[in-house]
């Protein structure tokens, strides 16, 4: 019974992560740039290094190019999982909550100026 609850919570978490990431895909280039600058400022060194690696893998010169390519995939979360671990995806979700002025979550937000 406990394992079913854990699986249900994990599935619910994946839906929340996916929904927030799709919000990133709907942003204008300027909005996305602002959010990704904030991500870089607040991410761990390991996450920033991984994002640099993914930029190279996708032949992108910047994070905007990378996220636009990831957003162009039919399933954004599946595409993220090709490049990032679940832990890294969770960090990305936390960064999105922190940096997105339009996020509808009860987390503190970063509003870069």
Curated annotation (Swiss-Prot):
Domain of life from the UniProt record: Eukaryota
Gene Ontology terms: biological process: defense response to fungus; defense response to Gram-positive bacterium; innate immune response; killing of cells of another organism
Gene Ontology annotations for the cellular component aspect, listed alphabetically: extracellular region
Subcellular location: Secreted
Signal peptide: 1-19
Keywords: Antibiotic, Antimicrobial, Copper, Disulfide bond, Fungicide, Immunity, Innate immunity, Metal-binding, Secreted, Signal
Gene Ontology MF: a single term: iron ion binding
Cystines in this chain: 25-71, 38-99, 60-65
Gene3D superfamilies linked to this entry: 1.10.150.440
Main location: secreted
Biological role: Has bacteriostatic activity against Gram-positive bacteria, but not against Gram-negative bacteria. Has fungistatic activity against some but not all fungi. Binds and sequesters copper and iron ions. Copper-chelating activity is crucial for antimicrobial activity against M.luteus.
Listed name of the protein: Antimicrobial peptide microplusin
Lineage: Eukaryota, Metazoa, Ecdysozoa, Arthropoda, Chelicerata
């Amino acid at each position: 019974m406990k394992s079913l609850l854990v699986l249900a919570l994990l599935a619910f978490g994946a839906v929340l992560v996916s929904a927030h990431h799709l919000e990133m895909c709907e942003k204008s280039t300027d909005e996305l740039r602002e959010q990704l600058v904030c991500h870089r400022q607040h991410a761990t060194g390991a996450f920033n290094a991984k994002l640099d690696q993914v930029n190279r893998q996708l032949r992108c010169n910047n994070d905007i190019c990378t996220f636009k390519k990831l957003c162009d995939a039919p399933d954004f979360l599946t595409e993220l999982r090709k490049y990032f671990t679940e832990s890294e995806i969770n960090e990305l979700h936390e960064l999105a909550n922190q940096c997105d002025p339009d996020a509808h979550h009860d987390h503190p937000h970063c509003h870069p100026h």
